[in-house]
Amino acid sequence: MKKVIIVGGGISGLTAGIVLQNSGFETHIYEKNPIGGGELTGWKRDGIYIDNCIDWLTNSKADDSEMYALWKDIGMLGEDIMMCSKDKFFSYTADGKTVTFWRDLERTRKEMLEISPEDEENIEKFINTVKIGEVFTVPANKPMDKFGLKELKKFMPFLKGMGAIRKAYAGMSLQDLADSFKSPVIGKAFTMMHPANTQAFSFIVSYATITSGSGDIPVGGSLAAALRICDRYKEVGGTLHTNCPVKKIVIAGKAASGVLLEDGTEVNADYVIAATDANHCFTKLLPAEYMPKKMKAVFDDKEHYSTFSKFHAIYLIDGKVGIPEDTSFWKCDGPMIGRTKMNACGTLCYDYDPETYPAEDKTLIQVKVIQYLEDCLEWIDLASKDKAAYDARRQEYADRLMAEIVKRYPEAEGKIRLIDTWTPATYASRCNSYNGAYMSFVADKDSKTVTTPGVIKQLKNVFLAGQWNMGSGGLPPAAVQGKFAAWRICKKEGVPCK
């Protein structure tokens, strides 16, 4: 039985481990944190559950898609796991008008036309393109660079659909899309969920996931999902070593002999999968020159590929004060959060999940504010050099956001309290995340998203897994990249990938 060491117990590492165990390998995952899951996680403060990750889960619909099958295989989803059904993507209110991106696409069309009949042509184009995007799915059985005619034929509707969307909004960012509308309320709504420099294509595909009914949330949230996946890995015979960081991958000629742990222990293996942040992999685990050329080109091209993260704050309110469940934004003349001047504020209200919100007479909300590179680096630097100043800034920003919530919902005055905050420095510390980013690169409107095969040409038995291998990242790319690393090992050994 061949032995595989997996560095990193996030969604990629766990997926690779489950697939390899099912395919007849012995696997060991080495994870630096007390539990597996990586950014798929949550925690408790004052007895209140705080969710870090899932706002919607692509390919969550129980169908015959490859991605749904993978979600089932690893324990993310299943017939016995209840789902929170999203009735909207989000809403935005300004100047007495509300734009809602409903799950019911026709309702969205109708309401947008009522707000701005003069935008009819633009609205119809947007709605019809979202309909096309409902074919979106994530190929999950084998890497796309290994597709043959059979796979190309199977995914032709998907490939044609994505091509049609890219053609319809070629060379357009979300800001460009927003500016194309005569209605400032409709236009501004498009820039609420994603950074304004994101390709319009990405927003359309994200929204289409909701309208297709394939973007719901498993009850219990991210931590429950992570623990299910960890349990599945152990059930199939895998060994998860927690609180066990890896110092480097040990190289012997054109192969790796294993890994060296931070405590000085050397562990040998036939294969190694680096299921970590890509920058961490090629600055700590392996020499920088081993980074694949396609990946390095993206890291080097800072003009067209950027990273971002967010400042997060969680609040608990005694009672119900009119905050709608799920995600809603409103126009405000808000404070500075880092270098971001808030002209809109939003809440994610967890009333939709009976297992995570605290009580029927309470309201739990999260506020997120985008932080771009300079702010992210400043958070990381401050956290490492002056913990007291870092904590003070977190509190200051949380107080500013609380004031905006009370302005919008006056009944919350005297009833709202801060539960917790976290920042780009949290992701950098916990997950070794590049620039504190919780997702991969944002490709601008003049660029293409890049998928890097998880192969290191100089090393015959080391493979890469993780969201940084695939487009803008996220949970589905992280999972499938773990599956693909396992697939490549199975292929080399001549065994079926299960």
Residue ranges and their predicted role:
Residues 239-240, 244-257, 421-433:
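Beta-rich nucleic-acid/ligand-interaction surfaces
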Residues 217-218, 247-360:
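Mid-domain catalytic core of redox enzymes
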Residues 2-135:
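N-terminal glycine-rich phosphate/pyrophosphate-binding loop and immediately adjacent elements
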Residues 184-197, 410-471:
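A glycine-rich dinucleotide-binding beta-alpha-beta segment and adjacent secondary-structure elements
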Residues 467-490:
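A conserved FAD-binding loop/helix module that cradles the flavin
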Residues 251, 491-498:
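Active-site-proximal substrate-binding core of FAD-dependent oxidoreductases
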